[in-house]
Amino acid sequence: MKKKVISALLCMTMVATMVAGCGDKKSSSDSDAPKKGSAKDFDWQNYKGTTINVMFNEHNYSKAVIKKIPEFEKKTGIKVKYSSTPESNYFDKLNTSLSSHSGDTDVYMTGAYQVWEYAPAGYMEPLDDYINNPALTDKDYNYDDFIPGVVGALKWDLTAGHKVGKGSQWALPMGWELNNISYNKKVLKEKGIAVPKTTDDLLKAAKALKGFNGSGTYGIAVRGTREWATIHPGYMSLFATWGAQDFAIEDGKLVCKLDSKEAIDMTDYWVKLIKEGGSTQWANATWYECGKDLGAKKAAMMFDASSNAYFNNYEGASAESGNIAWSTVPLPEGKTDADAKTNLWIWSLAMNKDSKNKEAAWYFIQYFTSPEYMLWSGTEGASPDTPRTSVMNSDEYKGIVGKADNYLESIAALEKNASIYFTPQPYFFECTTKWAETLQDLVTSNKYKSTEQAMKQLKKDLDKIVADIQIDE
């Protein structure tokens, strides 16, 4: 049944796209195709009086947008209604809204991985015809100013197993996150511990820092809940650096590679790191708990999004503001700096394909991914990982974000090997959730005799999940 469902969804998406190309559009709801025109037709007040609904994940990026919504409403005459939900149940709420096909949500906050499920299901409006339409896009928008690897990660051709970077532009970036080591520099200095550069160093440091500030304090914060979000930050970054991969295409099929020596060795190390240097509450740790513990001097180090630590370091953000510094990705034995890889996460704005207010929705996305807004959000809005080159190179940005100890330097060191290291496929969330369950079982139970046994069973489970995917090269 799965194969039939996927094929049908892809066909519906293709048909909808073909139909959208026929004829001009008089209003947002008449057709999927945005109206055509010239630059003289563009006016920020063109959709005055329209009301749009926006769904946000609770995050610094969305907090910055929300702060500027009154200015957007004044500039455009568009009324914005919004909700902001913690990540722990945000995507459940979003999925319910999108799957209803009611069009109640016009714009939503999402990540790059969601594209692989949402786009084939018909939940996303391709943005290319909006971006390239001078009647709908301000002449100063400058799409080419986006960092190519970041905006390209939100392009996909709807073919399972194919890498991102080709196909439609399904969303536009609010900010991107690479994953690396951050640490409390004051604590490490007081304890006489050097910043870990290798995986051996990291394990020794995490063990030595257990209980560094009393009962309940620990060496390193990493995510641990039984859901997909546990896999993509620190774990996947080290997984890729180790030389492992999740899937390969063989004879037109996706084949899971989690039983490789590299995958087993890396996972075995990760389990040991958590057991010997992690939190006793690791199984409940999300983005929020990891960052909060670093900022509260409960964790001495963290392997997570660079911005997660940044949000706890600017003035007044946490008890340890100003004491946090950044490093890169620890290197396994035999690896060099050139081998260091970091997995990308990209918070983005997307348009619901069922929206009845698509032009107004595009105005919202355009405004909150514009150079002007992103210069503000990257400096005064505490959204440090800007996706725009002009902002990243600006004196204002460097002057503010550059105050964070080794923040920009660590990003520069990892940027060339920052990528999405997962294989795009529509069962991504089912697979990574199963992966996280296995990881949690290895840490918290005696279900498996060894990491090797667990990973070999996981390989079998994931092969079954993706068995119906056929890839035509």
What are these regions (language model features)?
Residues 74-75, 79, 99-100, 167, ...:
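Extracytoplasmic/periplasmic substrate-recognition and gating elements
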Residues 70-153, 186-197, 291-293, 297-301, ...:
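Extracytoplasmic "Venus flytrap"/periplasmic binding protein-like
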Residues 44-46, 128-149, 224-225, 242-265, ...:
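Short, solvent-exposed loop/beta-turn-alpha elements that line the ligand-binding surface or hinge
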Residues 157-174, 179, 203-255, 271, ...:
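Extracytoplasmic/periplasmic solute-binding protein
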Residues 340-342, 404-461:
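C-terminal capping/gating helix-and-loop segments adjacent to ligand/active sites or protein-protein/ligand interfaces
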